[in-house]
Structures are given as C-alpha cells and as structure tokens.
Swiss-Prot record:
<feature type="domain" description="Toprim">
    <location>
        <begin position="82"/>
        <end position="177"/>
    </location>
</feature>
<keyword id="KW-0234">DNA repair</keyword>
<dbReference type="GO" id="GO:0006310">
    <property type="term" value="P:DNA recombination"/>
</dbReference>
<dbReference type="Pfam" id="PF13662">
    <property type="entry name" value="Toprim_4"/>
</dbReference>
<keyword id="KW-0862">Zinc</keyword>
<dbReference type="InterPro" id="IPR034137">
    <property type="entry name" value="TOPRIM_RecR"/>
</dbReference>
<dbReference type="Pfam" id="PF02132">
    <property type="entry name" value="RecR_ZnF"/>
</dbReference>
<dbReference type="InterPro" id="IPR023627">
    <property type="entry name" value="Rcmb_RecR"/>
</dbReference>
<dbReference type="InterPro" id="IPR006171">
    <property type="entry name" value="TOPRIM_dom"/>
</dbReference>
<dbReference type="InterPro" id="IPR015967">
    <property type="entry name" value="Rcmb_RecR_Znf"/>
</dbReference>
<dbReference type="GO" id="GO:0003677">
    <property type="term" value="F:DNA binding"/>
</dbReference>
<dbReference type="InterPro" id="IPR000093">
    <property type="entry name" value="DNA_Rcmb_RecR"/>
</dbReference>
<dbReference type="GO" id="GO:0006281">
    <property type="term" value="P:DNA repair"/>
</dbReference>
<feature type="zinc finger region" description="C4-type">
    <location>
        <begin position="59"/>
        <end position="74"/>
    </location>
</feature>
<dbReference type="GO" id="GO:0008270">
    <property type="term" value="F:zinc ion binding"/>
</dbReference>
<keyword id="KW-0479">Metal-binding</keyword>
<comment type="function">
    <text>May play a role in DNA repair. It seems to be involved in an RecBC-independent recombinational process of DNA repair. It may act with RecF and RecO.</text>
</comment>
Amino acid sequence: MNETNYNDIDQLIYLFSKLPGLGIRSARRIALYLLQDKDVRLKSLINNLVEIDKKIVKCEICGNMDTENICRICSSEYRDKSIIAIVETVAELWAMERSGNFKGLYHVLGHNLSAASRQNPSILRLPELLTRCFAENIKEVIIATNSTLEGQTTAYFITEYLKEHPAKISRLASGIPIGGELDYLDEGTVSAAINLRQPFE
C-alpha cells in the first residue's frame, strides 16, 4: 500500500471517528467493512450521500430537515395544528416522532442558551415562533428542551418571551432525568414525558 492510499484511508477513518457515538476502533471497523466490498457497499453509501446532499433542505416553517421546503409534518392534514412542541434541534424532533405519541407541530430552535458561552437569545428563532403562535391560533406550547442546565435556562427564557400569547405552556414531565437529552431516551420514556407533561410557569 503506497503512502497516498494509506493517508486516504486514515482520513476516512478519522472522519468516521468524528461522528457521534463512534470512537477510532468503531470507525476503523466501518471503514474496513466498506472497503472490503467497495463496489457495492462504499459506492452505495456515496450515491446515497450525494442524493441527500442534493435534496435535503430545512423546512421553512419549523426548521425540520426534509426533501421539501415545507416538511411532511407541517404539510400533513392529520397533525393537530393547535399544539406546537419547541425542541432544541432536529434530533429531539426525531426522538419525539419515534415515540409515535405526539401528533402536533414542532418548532426547532437550533440552539439552546448557555451562560458559559454567553449566547445571544436572538439565535433561538423566537420571533418566528411568536408569529406562528398568533397566525396559527396555537392553543398549547410544549417546551421540549432537554433537562440540562442549558435546556432549563432556555425553557424559562421561552416562557417569558411567550407571556403576551394566551396559549397554555407546558413542559415534558416524568421520565426525563436531570441532564437527560431526548435523543438518547427510549420511545417509551419519551411517550410518558409527553403524556404526563405539566404546566410550566
């Protein structure tokens, strides 16, 4: 194996190792798996990534990722359009969808507020949220930020921001441990948290 190829493979392993949940050993196994049958496995992955890169866009309404400018959730006639869940990222949106227990709409903040990083609240897409609440006649806002310090800080800030809107504001409840992130919880736990949500003041 010449030096150029060796460096290319090392770079592939390094890139895999930077994916969430993967260390260098897992990355090496994945790279080897793909390279051992590269005409099928590697090319299939490459083709899929190219297609995703071409098609995936951010939903203009909620911030979800989909192949349409207005995602399947926002455009669905079967969703309860009187309830909106506020999540930090698309990962939490997908976690709630996997639970199969939430049939409302979403609003992806894209960030949370961290005292340590002194982030500006303007990054949270709250003006868009307030506009949606009035325009879509939202009856309940579920704050589904994570149970981390940053998530709690963000939740309180959102509550203050939405005071001028009459919607009921609730918070995910039982089953979310302190410091817990929705994306790492099983579907049953997320379902319980949705069902047992409590008023948030």
